């Protein structure tokens, strides 16, 4: 089983329906707040079930949800097919999109599932698809020194505030015996220092890489903003 197989099937990464709903609502609110303008074209890469994507769609001109798992794409189309400015695509379809067509690319809680030799071509694709001056946000990046205990503590705090604390306790126990735990042991999760991810993003051709507030409930994970070089203005004759 690969990470794509895991997300393509039934899993228990969320401890309850309420956990899932609150998680996706928080992420959607954070993405919507980052949208640069009402007419912006936004790509959400590795969006998962994106239960509150309508909040993002209402904040921008065009929202493109990219998801590698085909079963998740089917759910997204069934849920959001009525929204004229929202489309659902595969990673392969992103590669076929016109260059210089996006204002914002968001990859939240994604790059930990990519090896470095997978992340590098992804960065190149995102750079090509962004308009000059467009923004890339990498969120929920895991630093090498982040303890699983810290992640668990942040989840329990989110659960306490969100009203699913008992379910979260049970979910943490189930995770020990889950496919997620086995896959994490087999494949690991990619971690990056701030210096390391900055170097990778700059090497891909982005400029102005800076730390920003993370998306979601866990402030111990990192987020970064970077931009495609703006086209220089032609000199006035």
Language-model-detected regions and their locations in the chain:
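Class I (Rossmann-like) S-adenosyl-L-methionine-dependent methyltransferase catalytic domain
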Residues: 1-35, 39, 49-85, 90-96, ...
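Structural signature of beta-strand start/N-cap positions in the alpha/beta core
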Residues: 41, 62, 101-103
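Conserved beta-strand/loop positions that form the S-adenosyl-L-methionine
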Residues: 45
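A conserved beta-strand element that flanks and buttresses the S-adenosyl-L-methionine
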Residues: 106
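Short catalytic micro-motifs in class I SAM-dependent methyltransferases
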Residues: 109-110
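Helix-capping/helix-break motifs at membrane-protein junctions
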Residues: 115-116
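A short glycine-rich, Lys/Arg-flanked "PGG" loop and its adjoining helix->strand segment in the class I
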Residues: 120-132
């Amino acid at each position: 089983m690969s990470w794509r197989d895991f997300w393509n099937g039934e899993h228990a990464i969320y401890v309850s329906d309420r956990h899932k709903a609150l998680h996706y609502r928080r992420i959607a609110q954070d993405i919507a707040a980052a949208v640069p303008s009402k007419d912006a074209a936004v790509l959400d890469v590795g969006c998962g079930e994106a239960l509150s994507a309508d909040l993002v769609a209402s904040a921008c001109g065009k929202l493109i949800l990219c998801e590698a798992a085909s079963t998740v794409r089917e759910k997204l189309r069934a849920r959001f097919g009525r929204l004229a400015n929202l489309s659902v695509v595969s990673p392969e379809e992103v590669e076929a999109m016109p260059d210089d067509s996006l204002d914002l690319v968001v990859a939240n809680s994604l790059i930990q599932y990519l090896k470095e030799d997978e992340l590098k071509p992804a960065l190149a694709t995102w750079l090509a698809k962004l308009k000059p001056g467009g923004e890339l946000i990498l969120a929920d990046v895991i630093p090498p020194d982040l303890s699983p205990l810290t992640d668990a503590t942040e989840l329990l705090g989110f659960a306490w505030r969100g009203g699913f604390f008992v379910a979260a306790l049970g979910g943490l126990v189930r995770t020990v015996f889950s496919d997620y735990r086995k896959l994490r042991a087999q494949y690991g999760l990619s971690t990056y220092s701030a210096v390391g991810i900055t170097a990778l993003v700059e090497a891909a051709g982005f400029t102005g890489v800076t730390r920003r507030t993370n998306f979601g409930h866990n402030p111990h994970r990192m987020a970064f903003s970077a931009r495609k070089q703006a086209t220089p203005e032609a000199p006035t004759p």
